[in-house]
Amino acid sequence: LAHRVAARWDTWLKRGFDFLLATALLLVMWPVLLLLRLVYGPMRRYPQLGRWCEPFEEFAFAVPESGLHRVVRALRLHRLPALFNILRGDMSFVGPRPVNVGPAVRDRLYRRTCSARPGLVCLHWIRSRSNIDFEGEAASDAEYELAAGVRTDVGIALRAVPALLYGSGDTEVPDTVSLL
């Protein structure tokens, strides 16, 4: 019973944090969103599977992978519209990687990731930009599922900053999920 109460508390704490941070970031980043909207047109909707394998549409800008557009992609600014998904409760800041509807249905390993909200940042994303060996996306998502909690999320979020700034396969980050 105590475990259920703690898990529920973690869920509500995480959801509240997600909502407040997404709201604050949207208030600060609206000029960037407006500029991206003017340059790249309207947001695209990508069908994904979310918590409990419920379908949802992830918002993002379609950005070419050439020229100056690489900077937008490298800084992941094209994913800023996903803040609206976080506000709606479709996504979280930290969680397993969002899964495309098609491949997820075929790959039974992804059934494991359906009990958590997909995240803007995930363990797989950090590991793919660092020197950490890992078995793959599904294994990273399953590992996150087993260790999910506020402490784990803070550890992943802290590792996301150097992975974003320096992540080209040469970033040194600790091989533990939890840094606190």
Residue ranges and their predicted role:
Residues 27-30, 74-78, 94, 145:
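Residue-level signal for short amphipathic helical patches enriched in basic/charged
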Residues 26-28, 39-41, 71-72, 101-106:
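A short linear-motif detector with a strong N-terminal bias
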